[in-house]
Structure formats: structure tokens, C-alpha cells
A protein has these predicted regions:
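Terminal, low-structured helical/coil segments at or just beyond the last alpha-helical repeat
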Residues: 2, 93-128
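Alpha-helical adaptor scaffolds
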Residues: 10-70
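Boundary/linker segments of alpha-helical solenoid repeat arrays
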Residues: 23, 56-57, 85-95, 122-127
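N-terminal leader/linker segments that initiate helical-solenoid repeat arrays
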Residues: 1-8, 15
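Alpha-helix initiation and capping sites
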Residues: 4-7, 21, 86, 105
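TPR/TPR-like (Sel1-like) alpha-helical repeat modules
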Residues: 73-89, 113-120
Length: 128
């Protein structure tokens, strides 16, 4: 799509001028993945995981990029790290198409089960 190509050119230019800008890197990584440029998206996500080592969303996105690159073991390791850091969106993780290569893997199912037991079953005290 022309709009994606223009956005990509714009973000690449901005990233060239602001190579350490986390928000620009996030947007660029997302756009690479959305447009099927998985290797480029993976490079951005790997860099973000070094710069933002305690950010669960960074690790979740890295897991997605790894899964899209047919690196299931590494994807599951990154996903585990995301969960350790607090990523808990069970519903999205179940249906995220970027993680579809992990579906059916016992380790993925175990991570989902742990999130469900830990976060989804916790009473919402605001509603009590």
C-alpha cells in the first residue's frame, strides 16, 4: 500500500535522525511487522529489548517477531520474559495472529494457563 510505503519512508528518515528514540523505534518495528518485513521488525525488536530490558510489551513484541521468523524456542523464551515482567493480556495472546506459530505448543499453552490462573481468576475488588 502506498500509505504504508510513505509511512515507512517517513519513519526510516526520522529514525535516521533520532536513532535512540524509543517511540520512533516502536513505531518502525510495528510497521515493519505489519507490512511483512519480519527480518527488519525483528532487528528493531531485538534492539528495543536491549534498550528497554524491563518493558513487558517490548518482550511481547519481540516474541511476536521471533514467532513470525519461525524461531519458536526463542519466541517462547521472550514471551516468558514478557509475562515475568507483567504482560498479562490473556485474551489478546490467545488470538494474536503473530503468535499463531506457537499454538499447539505445550509451552505456549502452559504460559496461557499460568496467565489465566494468575490474572483472570483474581477477583476485581472494585466490583465487590
Amino acid at each position: 500500500l502506498l500509505a504504508d510505503k510513505q509511512e515507512l519512508e517517513f519513519l526510516q528518515a526520522v529514525a535516521g535522525r533520532l536513532p535512540e528514540d524509543i517511540d520512533v523505534m516502536r513505531a518502525l518495528g510495528d510497521l515493519y511487522t505489519r507490512t511483512g518485513a519480519y527480518a527488519e521488525g525483528l532487528r528493531v525488536d531485538e534492539r528495543l529489548s536491549r534498550l528497554c530490558a524491563e518493558d513487558p510489551l517490548v518482550w511481547y513484541n519481540l516474541s511476536c517477531s521471533l514467532a513470525l521468523s519461525d524461531r519458536a524456542d526463542d519466541a517462547l523464551e521472550a514471551l516468558g520474559r514478557a509475562v515475568e515482567l507483567g504482560y498479562d493480556d490473556y485474551e489478546w495472546m490467545k488470538k494474536d495472529p503473530d503468535l499463531s506459530a506457537l499454538h499447539g505448543d505445550a509451552r505456549f499453552e502452559s504460559i496461557l494457563e499460568w496467565i489465566y490462573r494468575t490474572f483472570e481468576q483474581t477477583p476485581d475488588y472494585d466490583e465487590l
